[in-house]
């Protein structure tokens, strides 16, 4: 009896060592909260669902390894834009806006957009990493490495159908403090596209000064 079995090493970073179904949970969470953002009549509750939507998207991005973009979602959208919307909506007469709003007509459009988005997004991601073994010889040979291991090894206890699958990746909580993405983006912005960064800064400065000038009341002569 041959005790040597093929072990497939999948060079994969999309799940950061997590079970891939966690990505499905965050996808469903983001989809449902996005629907409630549209269907909720109370604007404040709608903004709270929007914060949950951005939180789910940020968690999804952190899990798949896009830590800089995921943290940017938390800082920019949740920390600034959503809270600003929440403060603005607190100054609005909510009862009047609730009487004038009718969001039931948006349900078919919401479902249609969700289906179209899912059809475009899901083919881009590995829905099931284990299913890749059925056709890795043809399409994913560069991502797989075959290693012969001995079945009597005490460290190998999770065999399924004589094949052991495991993924190598970076643990996501360690990637949160990893500055590779930030270093790469900063290097590009401050070296290659430095002139565009300066132009964008001047545009932002002009917008701030212009808004202050417009709001200042001119003194009556």
Curated annotation (Swiss-Prot):
GO MF term list: NADH dehydrogenase (ubiquinone) activity
Catalytic activity: a ubiquinone + NADH + 5 H(+)(in) = a ubiquinol + NAD(+) + 4 H(+)(out)
Sequence intervals crossing the membrane: 18-38, 44-64, 74-94, 107-127, 195-215
Catalytic activity, EC: 7.1.1.2
Compartments where found: Mitochondrion membrane
Xref: Pfam families: Oxidored_q3
Keywords noted in UniProt: Electron transport, Membrane, Mitochondrion, NAD, Respiratory chain, Translocase, Transmembrane, Transmembrane helix, Transport, Ubiquinone
Gene3D superfamilies for this protein: NADH-ubiquinone/plastoquinone oxidoreductase chain 6, subunit NuoJ
Membrane topology: Multi-pass membrane protein
GO cellular component: a single term: mitochondrial membrane
Keyword Amino-acid biosynthesis among UniProt keywords: no
Class of the enzyme per the UniProt entry, highest EC level: translocase
UniProt keyword Electron transport present: yes
Family statement: Belongs to the complex I subunit 6 family.
Function of the molecule: Core subunit of the mitochondrial membrane respiratory chain NADH dehydrogenase (Complex I) that is believed to belong to the minimal assembly required for catalysis. Complex I functions in the transfer of electrons from NADH to the respiratory chain. The immediate electron acceptor for the enzyme is believed to be ubiquinone.
Name used for this protein in its record: NADH-ubiquinone oxidoreductase chain 6
The encoding gene: ND6
């Amino acid at each position: 009896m041959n005790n040597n079995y093929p072990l497939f090493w999948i060079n994969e970073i999309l799940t950061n060592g997590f079970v891939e179904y966690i990505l499905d949970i965050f996808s469903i969470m983001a989809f449902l909260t996005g629907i409630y953002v549209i269907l909720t009549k109370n604007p404040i509750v709608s903004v709270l669902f929007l914060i949950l939507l951005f939180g789910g998207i940020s968690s999804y991005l952190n899990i798949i390894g896009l830590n800089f973009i995921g943290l940017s979602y938390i800082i920019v959208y949740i920390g600034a834009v959503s809270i600003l919307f929440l403060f603005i909506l607190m100054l609005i007469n909510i009862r009047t806006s609730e009487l004038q709003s009718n969001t039931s007509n948006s349900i078919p459009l919401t479902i249609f957009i969700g289906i179209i988005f899912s059809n475009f997004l899901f083919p881009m991601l590995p829905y099931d990493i284990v299913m890749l073994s059925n056709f890795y010889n043809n399409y994913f040979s560069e991502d797989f490495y075959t290693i012969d291991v001995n079945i009597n090894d005490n460290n190998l206890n999770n065999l399924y159908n004589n094949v052991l699958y495991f993924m190598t990746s970076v643990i996501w909580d360690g990637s949160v403090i990893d500055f590779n993405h930030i270093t790469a983006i900063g290097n590009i912005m401050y070296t290659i596209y430095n002139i565009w960064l300066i132009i964008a800064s001047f545009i932002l400065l002009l917008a701030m000064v212009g808004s202050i000038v417009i709001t200042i009341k001119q003194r009556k002569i």
